[in-house]
Amino acid sequence: MTSETRTLYSQLPAIDRLLHDSAFLSLRDRYGHTQVVDLLRRMLDDARDVIRNTQTLPDWYADWAQEAKLRLENAAQSALRPVINLTGTVLHTNLGRALQAQEAVEAVTQAMRAPVTLEYDLDGAGRGHRDRALATLLCRITGAEDACIVNNNAAAVLLMLAATASGKEVVVSRGELVEIGGAFRIPDVMRQAGCTLHEVGTTNRTHAKDYRQAVNENTGLLMKVHTSNYSIEGFTKTVEEAELAEIGRELDIPVVADLGSGSLVDLSQYGLPKEPMPQQLIAAGVSMVSFSGDKLLGGPQAGIIVGKKAMIAQLQSHPLKRALRADKMTLAALEATLRLYLHPEALAEKLPTLRLLTRSEASIREQAQRLQARLAARYGDEFALEVKPCLSQIGSGSLPVDRLPSAAMTFTPHDGRGSRLEALAARWRTLPVPVIGRIYDGRLWLDMRCLEDESRFMEMMLK
């Protein structure tokens, strides 16, 4: 160690002296003595590393309190930070999928703040069932005999298979052996459930006779899987749920369906692409239907299974049900969301997912044009700002081919350097509420479809 290095080490302050500095009093009051001391120890270690590697003091040496304040504030930020989603993907999996309705937020808050009748029967003063209230609502909406709630749709599929077909064959069309995010594959789930996959048909064509010929003494289920995250077009043939249900009745084999996204309303009435609805499959005679709570339904993450009472009872009594059951916050949010469907006239206004999906291109474009001049005054020296037409997508594997006409604010660097776009996007990610767009075709695009808090957005962007 050189004498110069020893001199630099000697200039590092003692923790006790820093703690008695008036600048640290407010930090100790806000974050507590223990947390501040732990941080100062780490800062001293960092300072020693800087001295050892560069033979200089750290650049924050002159103001330890300010550096400590910045580090404490950064550490105190929640890992789940609110962001402004201008990616053009409404149900963005990485950004938490469906926004919750105000009614759902209030229901969750109430469920967290007080004991609730999660598994308590007020009439009989005894134990109740946590799915009961939601099952009643779901049966009213879908026409099913009963319902079961778990923590996501992958869990719903696993439970359906394990509880009703473990040790047996499950017949599925080859064209429906889907994989969703995280390498969740139907064949893998079947193995975990103890089922044997029996593929029928080909990738693009499956006929009714394929299912009939596949049935044997060890067949447990006939299964339909909605290919919600991809589409096969051209020379294709599939067996519709109603026809498969008829085959199931003939052969006395239950038919189950995994809808994936699952919409409880006909989206075509809002000018959106039509998506299969659980109530249609129930009416067609399908024994059980599973779907997600946090996609097109617009609620919290949950797996919902509706169907025949006897089969739902098998699910409720299976050991996996306890491992996969939903908690009180999920159930509270889901119940509040489902109640919105009882008032369909107000659904597009009260359900954020539907409200965002049904925004007209004209209203989005008008919003972008209204903000353009003010943003150009802030960013125009470096970037050319234009309002351009674009196509939003629904996201989360819902309606993968369909796009929604929208409008975006685009930023193109005057000097054509892509690094400026990366730097701008990075700068926006450091805002108090990060703004997330996408870089494409030499521009940074901000699709305005999901921008609702316009004043907050502009306040941050203009700083």
Curated annotation (Swiss-Prot):
Its cofactor is pyridoxal 5'-phosphate. Its main location: cytoplasm. Pathway: Aminoacyl-tRNA biosynthesis; selenocysteinyl-tRNA(Sec) biosynthesis; selenocysteinyl-tRNA(Sec) from L-seryl-tRNA(Sec) (bacterial route): step 1/1. The keyword Cytoplasm applies. Its EC number is 2.9.1.1. It holds the Pfam family SelA. GO terms for biological process: conversion of seryl-tRNAsec to selenocys-tRNAsec; selenocysteine incorporation. The modification N6-(pyridoxal phosphate)lysine is found at K295. It catalyses: L-seryl-tRNA(Sec) + selenophosphate + H(+) = L-selenocysteinyl-tRNA(Sec) + phosphate. The keyword Acyltransferase does not apply. GO terms for molecular function: L-seryl-tRNA(Sec) selenium transferase activity. It is found in: Cytoplasm. One of its GO terms (cellular component) is cytoplasm. Keywords: Cytoplasm, Protein biosynthesis, Pyridoxal phosphate, Selenium, Transferase. HAMAP family: SelA. NCBIfam families: selA. Belongs to the SelA family. Converts seryl-tRNA(Sec) to selenocysteinyl-tRNA(Sec) required for selenoprotein biosynthesis. Homodecamer; pentamer of dimers. Binds only one seryl-tRNA(Sec) per dimer. PANTHER family: L-SERYL-TRNA(SEC) SELENIUM TRANSFERASE. This is L-seryl-tRNA(Sec) selenium transferase. The lineage of its organism: Bacteria, Pseudomonadati, Pseudomonadota, Gammaproteobacteria, Enterobacterales.
